[in-house]
Swiss-Prot record:
GO biological process, one term: negative regulation of viral transcription
Species assigned in the record: Homo sapiens
The keyword Zinc is annotated on this UniProt entry: yes
Function: E3 ubiquitin ligase that plays a role in antifungal immunity by mediating 'Lys-27'-linked ubiquitination of CARD9 downstream of C-type lectin receptors; leading to CARD9 activation, followed by activation of NF-kappa-B and MAP kinase p38 pathways. E3 ubiquitin ligase activity is dependent on E2 ubiquitin-conjugating enzyme UBE2D2.
A Pfam family this chain is assigned to: SPRY
Catalytic activity: S-ubiquitinyl-[E2 ubiquitin-conjugating enzyme]-L-cysteine + [acceptor protein]-L-lysine = [E2 ubiquitin-conjugating enzyme]-L-cysteine + N(6)-ubiquitinyl-[acceptor protein]-L-lysine
Gene: TRIM62
Keywords: Coiled coil, Cytoplasm, Immunity, Innate immunity, Metal-binding, Transferase, Ubl conjugation, Ubl conjugation pathway, Zinc, Zinc-finger
Record's protein name: E3 ubiquitin-protein ligase TRIM62
Length: 475
């Protein structure tokens, strides 16, 4: 069996790897220092021999072995553990009966003699068994990562497919909802149009009948008046005094019923009923059939923080810079957060209201569980029973989620619309000026909800002094 590579590179004198190898005439190799010291010890005998074959030399010449020195240098550049751990049982090189190694850096099998060692300097080289074990672990880790990625992609695809189906279903449902909403408006408009046209026809018929009756009556009276005038003209044409005077006595009888006072009275056709701000008139008549309309909410003074000032009608709330009001504390009242709740509690149905937030730099509005804590510092977030949006830092808007969700608002809000569909678990915020969407909470509400308002603190420099005001639509 062939010797290991290390055995081939050992000096037989020091039993270590060659250092500055030299060769003798017999072609055996030694470390220059080792053979020199050996021959120094033999000087007394007057002969110098080869420690391997015992061939003697009178004046031996030490020839440097550059090739062997290169092999030693290249061998030394490989990790010693890799060389020592190589097994003779490893797959042999076809050209050399030597142990094959594996370069982990290049991912390649290599033979020390066949391959150029310089190509693998500073590389991670190991034995076949160690390379097998390490690459097995590495590939298993990669397989696990791929399997994890496969599972994540499968779950993502399932989610996307579910969202695709839900989006299609929601779109179909929304088409129906939008169609029904507009059809209801169309139906209401058609009904109002029909009623108005019928009313117009009735007014027209009534007016025309009245006029026609008066035309008939005045036509009859006109004929009698004309007859009376004819009688008088004939009498006045009589020039004979006796004849003229003789017929005067019968004139009164002949003129009876011929003279009528006009006294014409009539009502103008009611055109004003069908002109003027016609669309506004129609809108007002439709308003009672539109649902939901902005609710006339009021604030609950019993929940208001002591710093808050409410209007007499409880629709306006402002932060007061003066000392806190001497209000009686109760479990209902906020004691740290400058907040107030609405008086009405919602547990079903569809509701909508609007809040004027113009010229403010800070506020919070939305909904709160009726049972939510009102004492101490409160985290305004769904897990605490609050579903709100907030204006902060002067011109930023966020939904109070966990963490906050920044809202994409182009222009500063002047009025915010709040839409609640309790049964569907929807709370939607709008820019009430153009009804553009701001944010949607989708929740399964566990109990009664109250509208929530916080005007924020005002500042001595005049910032945020404007109140929050519930917008009441009056028809």
């Amino acid at each position: 069996m062939a010797c290991s590579l290390k055995d081939e590179l050992l000096c037989s004198i020091c039993l270590s790897i060659y250092q500055d190898p030299v060769s003798l005439g017999c072609e055996h190799y030694f470390c220059r220092r080792c053979i020199t010291e050996h021959w120094v010890r033999q000087e007394a005998q007057g002969a110098r021999d080869c420690p391997e074959c015992r061939r003697t030399f009178a004046e031996p010449a030490l020839a440097p072995s550059l090739k062997l020195a290169n092999i030693v240098e290249r061998y030394s550049s490989f990790p010693l553990d890799a060389i020592l751990n190589a097994r003779r049982a490893a797959r042999p090189c076809q050209a050399h009966d030597k142990v094959k190694l594996f370069c982990l850096t290049d991912r390649a099998l290599l033979c020390f003699f066949c391959d150029e060692p310089a190509l693998h300097e500073q590389h991670q080289v190991t034995g076949i068994d160690d390379a097998f074990d390490e690459l097995q672990r590495e590939l298993k880790d990669q397989l696990q990562a791929l399997q994890d990625s496969e599972r994540e992609h499968t779950e993502a695809l399932q989610l996307l497919k579910r969202q695709l189906a839900e989006t299609k279903s929601s779109t179909k449902s929304l088409r129906t909802t939008i169609g029904e909403a507009f059809e209801r408006l169309h139906r209401l408009l058609r009904e109002r149009q029909k009623a108005m046209l019928e009313e117009l026809e009735a007014d027209t018929a009534r007016t025309l009948t009245d006029i026609e009756q008066k035309v008939q009556r005045y036509s009859q009276q006109l004929r009698k008046v004309q007859e009376g005038a004819q009688i008088l003209q004939e009498r006045l044409a009589e020039t004979d005094r006796h004849t003229f005077l003789a017929g005067v006595a019968s004139l009164s009888e002949r003129l009876k019923g011929k003279i009528h006072e006009t006294n014409l009275t009539y009502e103008d056709f009611p055109t004003s009923k069908y002109t003027g701000p016609l669309q506004y008139t129609i809108w007002k008549s439709l308003f009672q059939d539109i649902h939901p309309v902005p609710a006339a909410l009021t604030l609950d003074p019993g929940t208001a923080h002591q710093r808050l000032i409410l209007s007499d009608d409880c629709t306006i709330v402002a932060y007061g810079n003066l000392h806190p009001q001497p209000l009686q504390d109760s479990p209902k009242r906020f004691d740290v957060e400058v907040s107030v709740l609405g008086s009405e509690a919602f547990s079903s149905g569809v509701h909508y209201w609007e809040v004027v937030v113009a010229e403010k730099t800070q506020w919070v509005i939305g909904l709160a569980h009726e049972a939510a804590s009102r004492k101490g510092s409160i985290q305004i977030q769904p897990s605490r029973g609050f579903y709100c949006i907030v204006m902060h830092d002067g011109n930023q808007y966020s939904a109070c989620t966990e963490p906050w969700t920044r809202l994409n608002v182009r222009d500063k809000l002047d009025k915010v619309g709040v839409f609640l569909d309790y049964d569907q678990g929807l709370l939607i915020f709008y820019n009430a000026d153009d009804m553009s969407w701001l944010y949607t909470f989708r929740e399964k509400f566990p109990g009664k909800l109250c509208s929530y308002f916080s005007p924020g603190q005002s500042h001595a420099n005049g910032k945020n002094v404007q109140p929050l005001r519930i917008n009441t639509v009056r028809i």
